[in-house]
Curated annotation (Swiss-Prot):
Catalytic activity reported: guanosine(37) in tRNA + S-adenosyl-L-methionine = N(1)-methylguanosine(37) in tRNA + S-adenosyl-L-homocysteine + H(+)
GO-annotated biological processes: tRNA N1-guanine methylation
Encoding gene, per UniProt annotation: trmD
Residues involved in S-adenosyl-L-methionine binding: G113, I133, G134, D135, Y136, V137, L138
Pfam families per record: tRNA_m1G_MT
Name used for this protein in its record: tRNA (guanine-N(1)-)-methyltransferase
Annotated family: Belongs to the RNA methyltransferase TrmD family.
C-alpha cells in the first residue's frame, strides 16, 4: 500500500514514520510512505503557499495554485488509483470502521491542511474525502496524517499478526481486555488467577467479560453500536444486564 503525504512541513514526519512497526513494514515492502513538500509547486521566489483570505478575517489560507499542482503531480506519480483525503477539523470523524475501509485501498493521498485551511475551490474539485481525528483543533493536519498512516498501515496484511488485531479495542465496537505480564505479583497486586490457570476456554470467557465490563464503564455509547451490528451474543447481553446495562441509556447521556 502506498501513502503520499502532501505537507508544508515535511520535517515534522522525521522520526514517527521511521520507527517501530512502520519502519519494519516499509523495510518489508508492505507499505510505502512518500513525503511531498507543497512549496515545491510554488512559482515565486519566496515559495509562497498561503495568502490572506478574501473578505478579511484573521489568519492565512493555503493557495489554490500550488496545492492543486501538487495533488495532480502526486496523483500522476503512480498508476495505482488513490483516494485524496484532506485532514481537517471539518471532516468526518475517523473511526476504526473507516480505518478498515481505507486499509483495503491501494493508495492514499493525505493532504495536510494548515493555517485557516485551504482554498475552498481545491476542496470542491480535488478532494475526495475529508477526515478529522477528533473534535478539537490542531495547528495543522500533519499530526492527523500520522495518525491515519499508523492506524491504516497496521491493518495492511503482513504488517501485524492478524490474531493481534482481532481483539483490539474498537475492532468490534468493544474495548480491549486488560493485559498482564511477569511478575505474577507486583507491589502486592496479583495477576487474575484465571490467566495463570492454563484453561484456554476460561481465559477466553474472562477476556470477553472484561471487554464488555470495560466498554460499559468507559464507553457505554459503543455498546448500542455493538448491539446494532449483531456482535453481542446472548451470553454477552445477559452479563451486561447483570452489570446494569440498559440499551436505552447506552448513549452515555
Amino acid at each position: 500500500m502506498r501513502f503520499d503525504i502532501l505537507t508544508l512541513f515535511p520535517a515534522m514526519f522525521q522520526g514517527p514514520l521511521t520507527e517501530s512497526i512502520l519502519k519494519r513494514a516499509q523495510q518489508a515492502g508492505r507499505i510505502e510512505i512518500h513525503l511531498h513538500d507543497i512549496r515545491q509547486w510554488t512559482t515565486d521566489r519566496h515559495r509562497t503557499a498561503d495568502d490572506t483570505p478574501y473578505g478579511g478575517g484573521a489568519g492565512m489560507v493555503m493557495k489554490a495554485e500550488p496545492l492543486a499542482a501538487a495533488i495532480r503531480a502526486v496523483r500522476a506519480a503512480d498508476e495505482r488509483p488513490g483516494v485524496t483525503i484532506l485532514l481537517t477539523p471539518d471532516g468526518e470523524l475517523l473511526t476504526q470502521q473507516i480505518v478498515r475501509e481505507l486499509a483495503t485501498l491501494p493508495r492514499l493521498l493525505l493532504v495536510c491542511g494548515h493555517y485557516e485551511g485551504i482554498d475552498e475551490r481545491v476542496r470542491e474539485t480535488l478532494i475526495d474525502r475529508e477526515l478529522s481525528i477528533g473534535d478539537y483543533v490542531l495547528t495543522g493536519g500533519e499530526l492527523a496524517a500520522m495518525v491515519v498512516v499508523d492506524a491504516v498501515a497496521r491493518l495492511v496484511p503482513g504488517v501485524i499478526d492478524s490474531e493481534s488485531i482481532v481483539e483490539e479495542s474498537h475492532s468490534d465496537f468493544l474495548l480491549e481486555y486488560p493485559h498482564y505480564t511477569r511478575p505474577a505479583v507486583w507491589e502486592g497486586r496479583a495477576v487474575p488467577p484465571v490467566l495463570l490457570s492454563g484453561h484456554h476456554g476460561e481465559i477466553a470467557r474472562w477476556r470477553r467479560a472484561e471487554r464488555l465490563r470495560r466498554t460499559l464503564v468507559r464507553r457505554p455509547d459503543l455498546l448500542a453500536r455493538a448491539a446494532a451490528a449483531g456482535v453481542l451474543t446472548k451470553a454477552d447481553l445477559a452479563l451486561l444486564a447483570e452489570l446494569g446495562w440498559r440499551p436505552e441509556t447506552s448513549n452515555g447521556a
